[in-house]
Amino acid sequence: MNTAPILLFVYNRPAHTRRVLEALSRNALAAESDLFVYSDAARSEADRAAVTETRRIIRQARGFRQIHLTERPQNLGLAGNIIDGVTTIINQYGRVIVLEDDLVVAPHFLQFMNDALEAFKDEPQVGHIHACEF
């Protein structure tokens, strides 16, 4: 399967980041997927240690085909980081699975998302696919 890249946005929550990485890596398609992580820079000195620890956890992650970590040298804020990251990956790959650091996914999440992206890739009325319904 030609899997969609996974795009994860993180900031200063190392415990959350560890949980999302562990959940993602338990997915069968993780080993076939490239993970792109965009880590925003600390907004203040008070956030610096948590940002550094979050980045350390990402560098130690395993279970993916490749892990690409973008460490922002300056804080872009949530919107700036997401807009730039999504735009970059969409322009490179044409599709993406987007996550933030507080989303712990189910074991078949990557299969579901990749199957749905493939099923609807030529459907002009489908703009996005999401995995959460309230």
Q: What do these predicted regions represent?
A:
Residues 108-134:
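Conserved donor NDP-sugar-binding/catalytic core segment of glycosyltransferases
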Residues 74-81:
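A short, glycine-/small-residue-rich helix N-cap motif at loop->alpha-helix starts
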Residues 83-95:
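Active-site nucleotide-sugar/metal-binding loop of Leloir-type enzymes
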Residues 38, 72, 128-132:
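Short glycine/serine/threonine-enriched helix-capping/active-site loop
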Residues 7-8:
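Short hydrophobic beta-strand elements that form part
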Residues 93-104:
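Short beta-strand-to-loop acidic/aromatic patch adjacent to the donor-nucleotide binding site
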Residues 13-28:
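Short, well-formed alpha-helical segments that are part of the catalytic scaffolds
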Residues 24-70:
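Acidic donor-binding segment of Leloir-type glycosyltransferases
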